[in-house]
Amino acid sequence: MFLINLLMYIIPILLAVAFLTLVERKVLGYMQFRKGPNVIGPYGILQPFADALKLFIKEPLRPMTSSISMFTIAPTLALTLAFTIWTPLPMPNALLDLNLGLLFILALSGLSVYSILWSGWASNSKYALIGALRAVAQTISYEVTLAIILLSIMLINGSFTLKNMLITQENMWLIMMTWPLTMMWYISTLAETNRAPFDLTEGESELVSGFNVEYAAGPFAMFFLAEYANIMVMNAITATLFLGSPLSSNIPYINSMTFMMKMLILTTTFLWIRASYPRFRYDQLMYLLWKNFLPITLALCLWYISIPISLSSLPPQL
């Protein structure tokens, strides 16, 4: 029974990630006035499965001078973390209803840095190492902003539990009163998942492919799946925190459908941004965080602390 539960949890995520790759290629294709994949299956719908089959039947090569254990562990760790981070999300019921769901998500997103660092270091390649160091610096930097925004949300919510976020937003979405935080959160999630215009780790003109340049076949596919699973989970968290489904409906399917629609719209916006914006320069990326986002988020965090106290009101759970 445990194995069936695990499969019922993992397989939908894998299918969602597979079709996200197809949606991305279709969106980019139509934005560039072409069709995208349209040969394999009707309208190219079987393209992700053909790609997966091709990748997993190829021989996984590795450099002679690489560290075997770390080189193998890094993609496995990346995919495991990408799947585990889904567990506390209320859709509308969570697989694990944790009391400290927000902290759990923050901790796991921080751990993903290790898989990137290990893959870059174990490859024993200059390009891979530079890409990994860039990714680590970028991810750790933007996690500071994400943590402060989560702290502000927690102060409004009065709890670390994600289920309470939906209760807090029964009457009004949190985006209405915290729209500056929402904008900064969304841009920070772009940087956190290494997506355009912040994909400095995969700068093809500079670093060939970044930290995963030496990976091929199955391990490369695992990194690819982890990246897209992280994109989806970040948008799921955004939908929960700022666009929480109201619990007015007693039918769980309706809540799940509205949640998935919000997540799909946010994910499509990720793809739209990729098609529209050029890549940032690395110093501009860091300047945006440390000189712009950090002071504003700190000021807003103090604002959200002081307002309830000054108005003599406390969060609903206290």
Swiss-Prot record:
PROSITE patterns: COMPLEX1_ND1_1 (PS00667), COMPLEX1_ND1_2 (PS00668). The chain crosses the membrane at residues 2-22, 68-88, 100-120, 136-156, 172-192, 223-243, 253-273, 293-313. Its EC number is 7.1.1.2. It is a multi-pass membrane protein. It is found in: Mitochondrion inner membrane. GO terms for cellular component: mitochondrial inner membrane. InterPro entries: NADH_UbQ_OxRdtase_su1/FPO (IPR001694), NADH_UbQ_OxRdtase_su1_CS (IPR018086). It is an enzyme of class 7 (translocase). Keywords: Electron transport, Membrane, Mitochondrion, Mitochondrion inner membrane, NAD, Respiratory chain, Translocase, Transmembrane, Transmembrane helix, Transport, Ubiquinone. One of its GO terms (biological process) is aerobic respiration. It comes from the Eukaryota. Disulfide bonds: none annotated. One of its GO terms (molecular function) is NADH dehydrogenase (ubiquinone) activity. It catalyses: a ubiquinone + NADH + 5 H(+)(in) = a ubiquinol + NAD(+) + 4 H(+)(out). Belongs to the complex I subunit 1 family. Core subunit of the mitochondrial membrane respiratory chain NADH dehydrogenase (Complex I) that is believed to belong to the minimal assembly required for catalysis. Complex I functions in the transfer of electrons from NADH to the respiratory chain. The immediate electron acceptor for the enzyme is believed to be ubiquinone. This is NADH-ubiquinone oxidoreductase chain 1. The lineage of its organism: Eukaryota, Metazoa, Chordata, Craniata, Vertebrata.
